[in-house]
């Protein structure tokens, strides 16, 4: 069996990147160095893998779910001592043995596992990761990136926007048309870079946890005014005091509140709750 005889499996969300310009762009933004230990998720036919291995790096470790591709990939890169391959599902694979070595994560993400992948590699509010990733480069569904980068007042703004922007620096590199893939997906993709914030640059862990809860409650009822969503965690009296002392308009809807104001609101909620205990 060879790559030409391998048929993509729809259940794995396989859309292989075939646009050489985008492959080169991913390599360029990765800014690879000799010390880099790269984790590539879903190498597929190995087109991007080949580009990355052309650079001097310490190691490229790839994880591929499709068992039919394992022998093909091992054969393709059999002469490259910096390449290693593991068969498995990235959502359940134990990375403990290599996690502290990994410096960069690169992937063309299957659309159906975008959320869990972001949680694992970019991180979550209220959880300080022990990973050493300095750069995460993902090719993702465009509308997800639009939501992640949305600012207050934008209809795309949501809990994901606030969470992701609070734990990482994010750069949109370029949009990628369906024709860049085999087979072409139905939607555009976007190449995006996440640079996770170091622990010392993050908010206080207790504040992050409270803010995460506040975002979940608020955006679950995004059509409601903040005044009406807070009643599940604060009394009517507390909400009234908060609205009088806060710089936030409590008649605003969640998507209209800036990240800085979300932080101030969480701080104020914690303060008033502690005072009344």
From Swiss-Prot:
Reaction equations catalysed: adenosine(1518)/adenosine(1519) in 16S rRNA + 4 S-adenosyl-L-methionine = N(6)-dimethyladenosine(1518)/N(6)-dimethyladenosine(1519) in 16S rRNA + 4 S-adenosyl-L-homocysteine + 4 H(+)
Keywords: Cytoplasm, Methyltransferase, RNA-binding, rRNA processing, S-adenosyl-L-methionine, Transferase
Subcellular location: Cytoplasm
InterPro entries, A to Z: KsgA/Erm, rRNA_Ade_diMease-like_C, rRNA_Ade_Mease_Trfase_CS, rRNA_Ade_methylase_Trfase_N, rRNA_adenine_dimethylase, SAM-dependent_MTases_sf
Chief site of localization: cytoplasm
Pfam families (UniProt xref): RrnaAD (PF00398)
Keyword S-adenosyl-L-methionine: yes
Binding positions for S-adenosyl-L-methionine per the UniProt entry: 15, 17, 42, 64, 89, 108
Molecular function terms, GO-annotated: 16S rRNA (adenine(1518)-N(6)/adenine(1519)-N(6))-dimethyltransferase activity; RNA binding
CDD domains: AdoMet_MTases (cd02440)
EC number: 2.1.1.182
Record flagged with keyword Disulfide bond: no
One Gene Ontology term, aspect cellular component: cytosol
Protein family: Belongs to the class I-like SAM-binding methyltransferase superfamily. rRNA adenine N(6)-methyltransferase family. RsmA subfamily.
Task performed by this protein: Specifically dimethylates two adjacent adenosines (A1518 and A1519) in the loop of a conserved hairpin near the 3'-end of 16S rRNA in the 30S particle. May play a critical role in biogenesis of 30S subunits.
HAMAP family per record: 16SrRNA_methyltr_A (MF_00607)
Record-given protein name: Ribosomal RNA small subunit methyltransferase A
Species the sequence originates in: Prochlorococcus marinus subsp. pastoris (strain CCMP1986 / NIES-2087 / MED4)
Gene behind the chain: rsmA
């Amino acid at each position: 069996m060879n790559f030409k005889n391998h048929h993509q499996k729809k259940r794995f969300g396989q859309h292989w990147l075939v646009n050489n310009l985008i492959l080169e762009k991913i390599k360029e933004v990765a800014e690879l160095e000799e010390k880099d230990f790269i984790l590539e998720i879903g190498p597929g036919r190995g087109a991007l893998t080949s580009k990355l291995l052309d650079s001097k790096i310490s190691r490229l470790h790839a994880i591929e779910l499709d068992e039919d591709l394992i022998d093909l990939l091992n054969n393709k890169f059999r002469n490259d001592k910096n390449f290693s391959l593991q068969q498995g599902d990235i959502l359940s694979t134990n990375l403990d043995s290599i996690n502290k070595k990994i410096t960069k994560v690169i992937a063309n993400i299957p659309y159906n596992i975008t959320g869990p992948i972001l949680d694992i590699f970019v991180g979550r509010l209220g959880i300080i990761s022990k990973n050493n990733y300095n750069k995460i480069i993902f090719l993702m569904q465009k509308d997800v990136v639009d939501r992640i980068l949305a600012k207050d007042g934008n209809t795309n703004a949501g809990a994901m926007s606030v969470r992701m922007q609070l734990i990482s620096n994010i750069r949109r590199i370029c949009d990628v048309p369906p024709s860049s893939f085999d087979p072409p997906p139905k939607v555009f993709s976007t190449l995006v870079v996440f640079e996770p914030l170091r622990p010392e640059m993050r908010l206080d862990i207790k504040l992050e946890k409270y803010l995460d809860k506040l975002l979940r409650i608020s955006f679950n009822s995004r059509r409601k005014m903040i005044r009406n969503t807070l009643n599940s965690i604060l009394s009517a009296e507390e909400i009234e005091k908060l609205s009088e002392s806060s710089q936030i308009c409590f008649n605003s809807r969640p998507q209209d509140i800036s990240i800085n104001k979300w932080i101030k609101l969480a701080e104020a909620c914690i303060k008033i709750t502690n005072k009344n205990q």
